[in-house]
């Protein structure tokens, strides 16, 4: 890793769906390809990652079917740890030194989440994967990504999406007139009710002047490009 004062540090948010290739569970081919992209970019950039768990459980959806929301959210958090461990394995196969930190104590599989330790890992050239969300119910992993980015002093949050390549004026899956935005302010995104990223994450970044880039995972190479800082997707800022 190069001089700490000049090295770019980013927080990459990966949805659980990106691990399953649209299916439940983990698709080894998909995660292996993703890990190779991240490992390549991490040679010159300090990379921390927050992973979702939607390929296993979605707490909000389970709670709509009558399950206690807190319990459902904890199940989702455990799903994110499974994804974190899978990604760690494939990153190490790709030659990248990696650490997993969990917001819920599980010392046999992951370190506890300690911000200063995470920063030290990054400075040593290791990729740090944050699992178990915030360790608290009612917090989305989008919000956790914004919070972790602020705490480790990343320069921006990179939100990788499946099925869309940035922020649109509406939902492109249901609104044929929706157009891709090159840039948008947090205020505008919140006022329009744009749902591509959780509104709490938008608010947290807005209040702390943290830049966000929302981009599509396809085609291959996009994750590497985003981590390196190439112009891609939609820039969300103040």
From Swiss-Prot:
PANTHER family cross-referenced by the UniProt entry: URIDYLATE KINASE, URIDYLATE KINASE PUMPKIN, CHLOROPLASTIC
GO cellular component, one term: cytoplasm
Designated gene of the protein: pyrH
Keywords, alphabetical: ATP-binding, Cytoplasm, Kinase, Nucleotide-binding, Pyrimidine biosynthesis, Transferase
A Gene Ontology molecular function term of the record: ATP binding
Annotated organism of origin: Clavibacter michiganensis subsp. michiganensis (strain NCPPB 382)
Catalytic activity: UMP + ATP = UDP + ADP
Biological process (GO), any one: UDP biosynthetic process
Name listed for the protein in its UniProt record: Uridylate kinase
